[in-house]
Structure formats: structure tokens, C-alpha cells
């Protein structure tokens, strides 16, 4: 648990280690080791470790998950698709959190939020299966009111709002519209009693506005940290992101946006 969790400015950083595994798999080597990266990220201030075990195992593989689980000191947040195989793995491994995400083999990265409205029965059943195994469930969804309501109705206690459209906005006006959608989504989630996280596409120059939203409990960030680490080192990259997030939250609470 980080020091920042004891302050009014509490906001957690979940460091996603997927692209450490991507770098490893590019040459089929045993390095860089994503488990080592996870443990170093915790030492540098990460509040959780996020990893996505995709069906095609394009980056994280089963051995990474199994090796990391008993060694993680903060929380493991395992992202996975709503499939029997992945749910069985999650129930066996029992991460602290399981974030259910949509998945397509053709995509480079997750392209949007889980359609809870359209797949309500399957998602609700998955939530129950995971909860019965003692795993806290999060649903990765777009900041859409109908999706947020449906997420609440599944019994999931946590949502993670997809920030990809905000991150990929082509101009300031579009980015502002997407930011307002996220802010509205945060308020809607909190009103329903949900813990609200956010993530996807956030980096060192666009995270400030999102981190400043007082209702967001956690941001999950990976690619930007891995990329920045090439130039400043892994520990520094994690520390810098956490510092930026906390500074943005503190400034917002004190009227200094």
C-alpha cells in the first residue's frame, strides 16, 4: 500500500507489464523478464501490477501469471476475456482483481470497452464465477451511461473506464468532448457505488486531466511507461508517472488545475 493511499489525494497507479513481455517475445529470449519488471515497479511506487493474458498469448504467457502471483506484494490485476478458458485460469490463479475486457485477435491493442449491455448474461455469469472464487471483478467499459448501469447490474464492484478515445483525439475540441464523457462516467459510477478506475492510451503529457478527476481511484498504464523507460530507466519511468498523477490530483483538490 502506498503512502498516497493515506492522503486525500489518493490515486493509485497500476503498472501494466504487457509490453515488457512484448519486447521479450520479439526475439524469443528469456529477457526482459516481466516478473522482474513487476517487482521493480512495486519498489518504485506502483500500487498494482496489471497484465493481460490474451487468448493468443502474444505477450504475457501463462508462466508469467503463475510465477508472478505468489511474488506480487501489492495487487495483481489480471485482464482477461470472457471465455471459459480464461475464467478458469483466473479462478485457479485467484488474482486480487480480474478485469474483464473485450478481445479480438486482429487488434493491435484493445480497441474499445466491453459491451456489457449486449452480452449481459455472459458477463453477469462471469462476474459470479470470479466472485465465488474470491476474485474482485472489474469491467473495462466505455464511459457510456447504459454500459455503466449494466456493469452495476452484473454485480461487479469495479469499472475501468476506457480512455483510448480521449488519448487518440485528433484535436483539442475532440479531446475535451471525450474528457467530458469520462468525467460524466466517473460521476455516474460513483453514484452507483462503484469503484471507478480508468486507463488505455494514457501517457506523460495527457494523463494530468484524467488523474485530476477526484473520483478516479486508479489508472492503469503500461505502454507509455515501457517506452519512457528506454530513455530514463524503468524505476524512473514508474516514479515519474506516479508523481505526475499525484501532483495533478493535489493541484485539482487545491484549485490549481
UniProtKB/Swiss-Prot annotation:
Its protein name is Pyridoxine 5'-phosphate synthase
Q: Name one GO cellular component term.
A: cytosol
Q: Which domain of life is it from?
A: Bacteria
The lineage is: Bacteria, Pseudomonadati, Pseudomonadota, Betaproteobacteria, Burkholderiales
Which residues bear the site annotation Transition state stabilizer?
160
Pathway assignment reads:
Cofactor biosynthesis; pyridoxine 5'-phosphate biosynthesis; pyridoxine 5'-phosphate from D-erythrose 4-phosphate: step 5/5
List, in alphabetical order, the GO biological process terms annotated in this UniProt record. pyridoxine biosynthetic process
CDD domains (UniProt xref):
PNPsynthase (cd00003)
Q: Does the record carry Magnesium as a key word? A: no
InterPro entries found in the cross-reference section:
Aldolase_TIM, PyrdxlP_synth_PdxJ, Pyridoxine-5'_phos_synth
Q: Which family does it belong to?
A: Belongs to the PNP synthase family.
Describe the task this protein carries out.
Catalyzes the complicated ring closure reaction between the two acyclic compounds 1-deoxy-D-xylulose-5-phosphate (DXP) and 3-amino-2-oxopropyl phosphate (1-amino-acetone-3-phosphate or AAP) to form pyridoxine 5'-phosphate (PNP) and inorganic phosphate.
What organism does the UniProt record list as the source? Burkholderia pseudomallei (strain 1710b)
Recite the UniProt keywords alphabetically.
Answer: Cytoplasm, Pyridoxine biosynthesis, Transferase
**Record keyword Translocase present:** no
Single GO term (MF): pyridoxine 5'-phosphate synthase activity
The residues responsible for catalysis, as annotated, are 52 (proton acceptor), 79 (proton acceptor), 200 (proton donor)
Amino acid at each position: 500500500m502506498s503512502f498516497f493511499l493515506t492522503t486525500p489525494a489518493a490515486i493509485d497507479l497500476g503498472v501494466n507489464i504487457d509490453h515488457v513481455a512484448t519486447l521479450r517475445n520479439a526475439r524469443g529470449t528469456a529477457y526482459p523478464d516481466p516478473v522482474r519488471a513487476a517487482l521493480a515497479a512495486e519498489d518504485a511506487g506502483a500500487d498494482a501490477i496489471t497484465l493481460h493474458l490474451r487468448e493468443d498469448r502474444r505477450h504475457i504467457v501463462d508462466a508469467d501469471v503463475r510465477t508472478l502471483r505468489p511474488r506480487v506484494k501489492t495487487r495483481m490485476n489480471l485482464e482477461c476475456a470472457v471465455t471459459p478458458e480464461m475464467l478458469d485460469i483466473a479462478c485457479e490463479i485467484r488474482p486480487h482483481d480480474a478485469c474483464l475486457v473485450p478481445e479480438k485477435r486482429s487488434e493491435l491493442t484493445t480497441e474499445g470497452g466491453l459491451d456489457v449491455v449486449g452480452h449481459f448474461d455472459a458477463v453477469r455469469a462471469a462476474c459470479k464465477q470470479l466472485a465465488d472464487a474470491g476474485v474482485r471483478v472489474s469491467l473495462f467499459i466505455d464511459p457510456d451511461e447504459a454500459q455503466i448501469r449494466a456493469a452495476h447490474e452484473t454485480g461487479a464492484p469495479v469499472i475501468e473506464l476506457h480512455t483510448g478515445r480521449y488519448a487518440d483525439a485528433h484535436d483539442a475540441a475532440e479531446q475535451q468532448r471525450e474528457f467530458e464523457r469520462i468525467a460524466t462516467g466517473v460521476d455516474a459510477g460513483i453514484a452507483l457505488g462503484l469503484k471507478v478506475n480508468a486507463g488505455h492510451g494514457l501517457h506523460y503529457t495527457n494523463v494530468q486531466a484524467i488523474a485530476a478527476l477526484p473520483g478516479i481511484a486508479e489508472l492503469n498504464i503500461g505502454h507509455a511507461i515501457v517506452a519512457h523507460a528506454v530513455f530514463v530507466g524503468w524505476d524512473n519511468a514508474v516514479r515519474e508517472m506516479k508523481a505526475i498523477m499525484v501532483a495533478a490530483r493535489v493541484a485539482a483538490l487545491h484549485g490549481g488545475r
